């Protein structure tokens, strides 16, 4: 299209606006409103994303697409994801059914901002952060992640659990029935009355998986015998759909109601979503694991994983989202809990429900990490450089 033809086109469209003015005058329509609408249709550029976000900010909950097709609906649906708004394509049969069917009540997905932490005052006068994870488990939104060898030991796990945190006993070091039994006995002695821990089991290790959860079922048997275990974390791989559903039901049967899957890729997250869809009456906790820091079964960037799957995860009310991978400061943890991290990418806030702390916990008092390594962890600065799969920087 030449510059001349563009100019001619604009002139003709502007003339069309004038024609609308004439029609409005003849038919008694609001001339100002009619002209404004015509200008937006013919000659004025429209930032549709900004317009929709402005509607959301003004408190609008529904958009009615008057047609003639559902084009505007298809353009708008991605924009309103996470904003707590709905759109109805009134020119389609489905849209008309939702509008005119007696008793029909179209629903709106909750705004993602509704998942942000809220302050809650406890009976002792203290104020804590309330998230979907804290309401589900009764624990802090800061979790001690399972990692071999640090949380193979009972003391650090018990210390975290006694302080009100989710605390994972790493199955990577519980390599025989005798060692497992001894560790559970030690934990039972160290834990305060009413406290419990969670067991982290490596799905990728056939021997350990069969010993602990899948075959000999040491974890389930221990729970049935009164062991203080109320959660199982499936890490380093995701079972197939049928096996996962059977596992969830079995764990619920023995009193383990916190079932966690720890995906490290988009495909694995989608697998967990399918699992959650199959068990709508069971809570499924997802530990989305990025590849930063150490000890993770992921080579992916955490933000990329969340941006690709957050909307799908939030479609399921039985899914609770925790994240980890290089979150080493309170400030960074707060960005994920509040969801503000997503603003850097031009998205609405995407709050998560809990934060996994792993590598940073290696420097704690209770960790059996050597003093020299603890000091090195404290002194070593992080890097903003992303190291992809199969690559290395500085050795």
Regions found by a protein language model. Give the residues of each.
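Active-site glycine- and acidic-residue-rich loops that bind
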Residues: 1, 260-271, 327-338
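Conserved small-residue
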Residues: 1, 55, 63-67, 160, ...
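Non-catalytic positions within long, well-ordered alpha-helices that form the structural scaffold/packing
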Residues: 56-59, 64, 161, 225, ...
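Acyltransferase/transacylase module recognition
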Residues: 1-109
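Active-site entrance/lid segments in N-terminal catalytic domains of soluble metabolic enzymes
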Residues: 105-317
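Extended charged low-complexity segments that act as oligomerization/scaffolding linkers
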Residues: 30, 98-104, 111-113, 138, ...
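Glycine-rich adenosine-cofactor-binding loop
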Residues: 148, 318-337, 358
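Conserved active-site-proximal phosphate/metal-binding subdomains
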Residues: 313, 317, 337-395
């Amino acid at each position: 299209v030449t510059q001349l033809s563009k100019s001619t086109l604009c002139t003709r469209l502007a003339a069309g606006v004038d024609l609308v003015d004439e029609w409005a005058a003849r038919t008694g329509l609001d001339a100002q409103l009619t002209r404004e609408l015509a200008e937006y249709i013919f000659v004025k550029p429209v930032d549709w994303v900004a317009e929709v976000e402005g509607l959301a900010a003004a408190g609008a909950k529904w958009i009615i697409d008057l047609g003639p097709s559902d084009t505007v609906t298809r353009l708008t649906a991605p924009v309103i994801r996470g904003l707590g708004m709905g759109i109805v394509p009134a020119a389609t049969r489905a849209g008309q059914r939702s509008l005119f069917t007696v008793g029909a009540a179209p629903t709106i997905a909750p705004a993602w901002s509704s998942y942000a932490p809220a302050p809650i005052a406890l009976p002792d006068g203290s104020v804590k952060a309330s998230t979907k994870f804290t309401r589900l488990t009764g624990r802090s939104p800061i979790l001690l992640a399972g990692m071999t060898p640090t949380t193979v030991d009972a003391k650090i796990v018990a210390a975290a659990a006694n302080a009100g945190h989710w605390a994972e006993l790493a199955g990577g070091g519980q390599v025989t029935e005798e060692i497992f039994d001894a560790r559970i006995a030690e934990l039972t002695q160290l834990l305060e009355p009413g406290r419990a821990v969670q067991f982290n089991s490596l799905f990728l290790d056939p021997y350990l998986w069969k010993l602990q959860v899948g075959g000999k079922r040491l974890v389930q048997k221990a729970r049935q015998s009164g062991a203080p275990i109320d959660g199982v974390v499936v890490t380093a791989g995701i079972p197939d759909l049928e096996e996962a559903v059977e596992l969830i039901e079995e764990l619920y049967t023995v009193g383990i109601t916190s079932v966690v899957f720890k995906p490290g890729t988009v495909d694995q997250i989608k697998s967990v979503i399918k699992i959650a869809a199959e068990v709508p009456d069971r809570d499924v906790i997802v530990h989305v694991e990025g590849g930063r820091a150490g000890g993770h079964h992921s080579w992916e960037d955490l933000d990329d994983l969340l941006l690709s799957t957050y909307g799908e995860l939030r479609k399921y009310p039985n899914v609770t989202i925790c994240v980890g991978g290089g979150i080493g400061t309170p400030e960074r943890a707060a960005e994920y809990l509040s969801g503000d991290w997503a603003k850097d990418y031009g998205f609405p806030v995407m709050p998560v429900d809990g934060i996994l702390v792993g590598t940073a916990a290696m420097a704690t008092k209770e960790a059996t990490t050597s003093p020299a390594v603890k000091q090195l962890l404290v002194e070593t600065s992080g890097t903003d450089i992303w190291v992809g799969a199969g690559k290395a920087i500085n050795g």
